[in-house]
């Protein structure tokens, strides 16, 4: 895949992510915060962006969404065969929410030090 195609794909993913984020925020802000892994201030800012601002933000050359599955053990656990799919989804939610809480605590502690 050429570099131009990669950048085009990144821009499309970014815009899709931002549009999805706005839709999630409209439906339920607390659920959006959990699913997106961002704080309320960020949700408020994203919800107020116009389409032209979303397009501009989506056109940066880096992915704006973060892969929250950044631990090999977590990935292995979540991709393992499960006899009960619903249980696997609950387990995934627990793993991601725990990771989100750790992230927020770390950010809060960092902000207090400044």
From Swiss-Prot:
Principal subcellular localization: cytoplasm
Entries under SUPFAM superfamilies matching the protein: Flagellar transcriptional activator FlhD
Pfam families: FlhD
One annotated Gene Ontology cellular component of this protein: cytoplasm
Gene Ontology BP, a term: regulation of bacterial-type flagellum assembly
Domain of life of the organism encoding this protein: Bacteria
Locations listed in the record: Cytoplasm
Keywords for the protein's UniProt record, in alphabetical order: Activator, Bacterial flagellum biogenesis, Cytoplasm, Disulfide bond, DNA-binding, Transcription, Transcription regulation
Subunit and partners: Homodimer; disulfide-linked. Forms a heterohexamer composed of two FlhC and four FlhD subunits. Each FlhC binds a FlhD dimer, forming a heterotrimer, and a hexamer assembles by dimerization of two heterotrimers.
Classification via HAMAP family: FlhD
Protein task: Functions in complex with FlhC as a master transcriptional regulator that regulates transcription of several flagellar and non-flagellar operons by binding to their promoter region. Activates expression of class 2 flagellar genes, including fliA, which is a flagellum-specific sigma factor that turns on the class 3 genes. Also regulates genes whose products function in a variety of physiological pathways.
Protein family membership: Belongs to the FlhD family.
Protein name listed in UniProt: Flagellar transcriptional regulator FlhD
Organism: Wigglesworthia glossinidia brevipalpis
Gene that encodes it: flhD
């Amino acid at each position: 895949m050429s570099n131009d195609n990669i950048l085009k794909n990144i821009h499309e993913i970014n815009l899709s992510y931002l549009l999805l984020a706005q839709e999630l925020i409209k439906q339920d802000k607390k659920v959006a915060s959990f699913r997106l892994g961002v704080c309320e201030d960020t949700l408020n800012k994203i919800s107020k962006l116009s389409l032209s601002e979303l397009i501009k933000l989506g056109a940066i050359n880096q992915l704006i969404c973060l892969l929250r599955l950044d631990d090999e053990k977590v990935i292995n656990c979540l991709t393992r065969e499960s006899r009960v799919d619903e249980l696997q989804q609950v387990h995934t939610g627990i793993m991601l929410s725990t990771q989100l809480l750790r992230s927020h605590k770390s950010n809060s502690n960092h902000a207090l030090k400044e």
